[in-house]
């Protein structure tokens, strides 16, 4: 019994010593394990990019009317196929700044003439500073597929148009996260542009 009691009494100081050493090591090692810079790199990059680009309101004033014009020239009541949502602007806090992203729905339509589509895109968007490129590839389901991309780094806008041999074409655009210039009461309200939502371009659910 005495030996067991002595062992228990001897174990207590050892346990206390171990806890003390662990706490000391944790405190001493903390400076050597700072917050990794990778965790903050996205926020820094997003704010820097947004500072070099125009505002979300400027996109609605200067760019989106032409995007809708292009869309409505490519898509009409006779070749419209499917639209699953409406345009919207989302917001995200980054540090002490709110950034906004405009996203259009992907609209499906019937078309297989990639050259005609590219000509329409170039004629309207190249004068606004967009760079347009096209890439072709062979797919199993749709045959030849042409992806037409138009990018404007000043406004942070990217337009994607897919034209497929199967006649399943699609159109959509979105922005990078952008700052607000304060010119509107609600930066998340999409710009009021004529023909943004034609009566025939109804929302349809996926089949």
Please describe what each predicted stretch is:
Residues 30-72, 120, 126, 134-207:
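An acidic-aromatic pocket/loop used at catalytic or ligand-binding sites
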Residues 72-82, 128-130:
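Short secondary-structure junctions
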Residues 77-103:
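A glycine-rich, hydrophobic loop/mini-helix early in the fold
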Residues 97-135:
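Mid-length scaffold segments of soluble, non-membrane domains
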